[in-house]
Swiss-Prot record:
Gene: coaA
Domain of life the protein comes from: Bacteria
Protein name stated in the entry: Pantothenate kinase
GO biological process, one term: coenzyme A biosynthetic process
Pathway: Cofactor biosynthesis; coenzyme A biosynthesis; CoA from (R)-pantothenate: step 1/5
Keyword line: ATP-binding, Coenzyme A biosynthesis, Cytoplasm, Kinase, Nucleotide-binding, Transferase
Organism: Mycobacterium leprae (strain TN)
Subcellular location: Cytoplasm
HAMAP family xref list: Pantothen_kinase_1 (MF_00215)
Catalytic activity: (R)-pantothenate + ATP = (R)-4'-phosphopantothenate + ADP + H(+)
Length: 312
């Protein structure tokens, strides 16, 4: 049985308890497909998909159906005709967590699994990177050293985008970010057309504030968690690996790191982590963890072995 000690809004599971909740949910993902979804340095395998992600997909599938019934009940109470009866209200999922914790892989795997369920085959994934202010604007605001912190995002534009999707607009456009250029791409748009499910992935998507925030529009949210020292090690390892991949491209904003020796690269990575990523995690990202519907806790080997579900 899941662990229930003191009265709490959460119920905690180890992996064995959680995997039992898969029931008969089929695995509709191949090893080749998983390789394409796996991020640099991530260790996720099909066993973890079966034991962690399939129960999660089943839970979300059940909640999507329940949410649609709730919307229908509210419309009935208000005496309103059901708008676009063949087009359900989009179900919005937020995925949050630190840099290098693996939230992008989690979001991609979840997208692939949810799109294989009947009744919600249109599943879009948008990252909040595109809503960062362009570098020129960050420079004008003296925020380049705060890139990734909440104030470096155009939160009004992000709110307008999610509101448009949630309200059933025929389409909504999200700006596009280039990790190669380390900047938004002028004029580039990710067009979302009335999805059944929208997954919004980003560092600060669970932020709260004195006014309506994007997290207030979520129907379900995930926080990918791990010990801070483990995330730091994953960040450093990824930084070292990227010298031979993304950094090696002459067009990369970080091309100058590609020629660093291991020792110098480790020093550079730890300096970036300790001056930018760790403070952002501690000050802004980690405090939002209690707001998540489900927390996925990773061990040092990247495996998910503990989960905490919000039941209230």
């Amino acid at each position: 049985m899941p662990r229930l000690s003191e009265p709490s809004p959460y119920v905690e599971f180890d992996r064995k308890q959680w995997r039992a909740l898969r029931m008969s949910t089929p695995l509709a993902l191949t090893e080749e497909e998983l390789i394409g979804l796996r991020g640099l340095g991530e260790q996720i395998d099909l066993l973890e998909v079966e034991e962690v992600y399939l129960p999660l997909a089943r839970l979300i599938h059940l909640q999507v159906a329940a949410r649609q019934r709730l919307f229908a009940a509210t419309a009935e109470f208000l005496g309103e005709p059901q708008q676009n009866p063949g087009r359900p209200v989009p179900f919005i999922i937020g995925v949050a967590g630190s840099v290098a914790v693996g939230k992008s892989t989690t979001a991609r795997v979840l997208q692939a699994l949810l799109a294989r369920w009947d009744h919600h085959t249109r599943v879009d994934l948008v990252t909040t990177d595109g809503f960062l202010y362009p570098n020129a604007e960050l420079g004008r605001r003296n925020l380049m050293h705060r890139k990734g912190f909440p104030e470096s995002y155009n939160r009004r534009a992000l709110m307008r985008f999610v509101t448009s999707v949630k309200s059933g607009a025929d389409y909504a456009c999200a700006p596009v970010y280039s990790h190669l250029r380390y900047d938004t791409i002028p004029g580039a748009k990710h067009v979302v057309r009335h999805p059944d499910i929208l997954i919004l992935e980003g560092l600060n998507v669970l932020q709260t504030g004195p006014t309506l925030m994007v997290s207030d529009l979520f129907d379900f949210s995930l926080y990918v968690d791990a010990r801070i020292q483990d995330i730091e090690q994953w960040y450093v390892s990824r930084f070292l690996a990227m010298r031979g991949t993304a950094f090696a491209d002459p067009e990369s904003h970080f091309h100058h790191y590609s020629a660093l020796t291991d020792s110098k690269a480790i020093i550079a990575a730890r300096e970036i982590w300790r001056s930018i990523n760790r403070p952002n995690l501690v000050e802004n990202i980690l405090p939002t963890r209690p707001r998540a519907t489900l927390v996925l806790r990773k061990d040092a080997d990247h495996s998910i072995n503990r989960l905490r579900l919000r039941k209230l």
